[in-house]
């Protein structure tokens, strides 16, 4: 006999898991958080800033990027609190911004949908530049990370080498090219109605980028010419095969082409997509891949892809504490926890997948089957909402982990531009080591990076507002990007539970 997971039958469980005494139960302003989560990206911009730049303490930077290769590589985003443009996580950021618009754009106010598309275009434009010399060359990074991380200076003052790192055929860069394929494909869908010409350009470049990724299979971090500069920052720890499947899946979604359907069907097992199904982030795409492809099974009756749906359901069930089988770990206060730093990247990406899968199930009037449990879509939304509310302040610290949201939030984040005096207030350059005094200061950052979500607390739910503890205090673009979609949903459905 199946146990149906409904509030009336599990009152005690829901009360204990979702309303623990350590939590505040304040209602959050998800619309405000949504606006700020998008605004954050303006603080990460590289290149020439537009006249309507809202994060006004920032100025132009990285204006010579690409000149050593006689190519314009200006634009894009700095990944985190440094001044390097790492294409691997930037492409993932782009994919997730686009997916946020695709799945949840309908829930956004028109002004925030516009702002989301502006944020998306800022990175997709840069990625187009990075693949402009295909079929023989792809650019994967701009900025010497060793030199950059040895300095504490504003992006506007950068005097460290702005090395442009290229991978030339037949050397491989499958993980970066595969993720860039996904990013350009997803962006092409996001822009399809508002800018069809640009959408087509994105898609054409996605196709040729995938050809490079698949023809020259292998990891860019195994390339002797660049591996010491991409590792240990954004090494390919999980293998490149998941990015090939991920890129093909997005091309399938963008084109409807049967060849990509055949690719993801025939390569699932050879590429190991049945492993590590409970992971999703800038390095491991398997969790997101399974959810994305599941839509074809749930809504399109493509039962030849049933294995992807089975893995997606296994992942979803691992998030349900009452289900049998392996579970992901939660902190005592209910935050999704995985070993390593920057915990909130897991909370935002997995919350995104929970909401997307709940949407797929709801549209087909289905529930999730976890052994003897039948889990309705609203339960998945409840799990996601708990993560969101934790991030926004319902946690033992009583602290919002989004900068600028709520009354209490991190003031000493690990971020060069935010922690140094702005070029508006201090026009003179602050050179490499001269910024150390600001890094070591216990004073709050002078420039508020509104909307930035920091790495977050440890397994004990504790957080020290310490600039030097980058694992906890550093924001990243790939923490925020999926959070845009999550917040869009709850801004429109604040009572969803």
From Swiss-Prot:
<dbReference type="InterPro" id="IPR012341">
    <property type="entry name" value="6hp_glycosidase-like_sf"/>
</dbReference>
<dbReference type="GO" id="GO:1990059">
    <property type="term" value="P:fruit valve development"/>
</dbReference>
<feature type="signal peptide">
    <location>
        <begin position="1"/>
        <end position="24"/>
    </location>
</feature>
<dbReference type="InterPro" id="IPR018221">
    <property type="entry name" value="Glyco_hydro_9_His_AS"/>
</dbReference>
<keyword id="KW-0624">Polysaccharide degradation</keyword>
<keyword id="KW-0119">Carbohydrate metabolism</keyword>
<dbReference type="GO" id="GO:0010047">
    <property type="term" value="P:fruit dehiscence"/>
</dbReference>
<keyword id="KW-0326">Glycosidase</keyword>
<dbReference type="Pfam" id="PF00759">
    <property type="entry name" value="Glyco_hydro_9"/>
</dbReference>
<dbReference type="InterPro" id="IPR033126">
    <property type="entry name" value="Glyco_hydro_9_Asp/Glu_AS"/>
</dbReference>
<protein>
    <recommendedName>
        <fullName>Endoglucanase 24</fullName>
        <ecNumber>3.2.1.4</ecNumber>
    </recommendedName>
</protein>
<dbReference type="InterPro" id="IPR008928">
    <property type="entry name" value="6-hairpin_glycosidase_sf"/>
</dbReference>
<dbReference type="GO" id="GO:0030245">
    <property type="term" value="P:cellulose catabolic process"/>
</dbReference>
<keyword id="KW-0136">Cellulose degradation</keyword>
<keyword id="KW-0378">Hydrolase</keyword>
<keyword id="KW-0732">Signal</keyword>
<dbReference type="GO" id="GO:0009828">
    <property type="term" value="P:plant-type cell wall loosening"/>
</dbReference>
<keyword id="KW-0964">Secreted</keyword>
<feature type="active site">
    <location>
        <position position="465"/>
    </location>
</feature>
<dbReference type="GO" id="GO:0008810">
    <property type="term" value="F:cellulase activity"/>
</dbReference>
<dbReference type="InterPro" id="IPR001701">
    <property type="entry name" value="Glyco_hydro_9"/>
</dbReference>
<feature type="glycosylation site" description="N-linked (GlcNAc...) asparagine">
    <location>
        <position position="440"/>
    </location>
</feature>
<comment type="similarity">
    <text>Belongs to the glycosyl hydrolase 9 (cellulase E) family.</text>
</comment>
<feature type="active site">
    <location>
        <position position="474"/>
    </location>
</feature>
<dbReference type="GO" id="GO:0005576">
    <property type="term" value="C:extracellular region"/>
</dbReference>
<feature type="active site" description="Nucleophile">
    <location>
        <position position="82"/>
    </location>
</feature>
<feature type="active site">
    <location>
        <position position="414"/>
    </location>
</feature>
<keyword id="KW-0961">Cell wall biogenesis/degradation</keyword>
<keyword id="KW-0325">Glycoprotein</keyword>
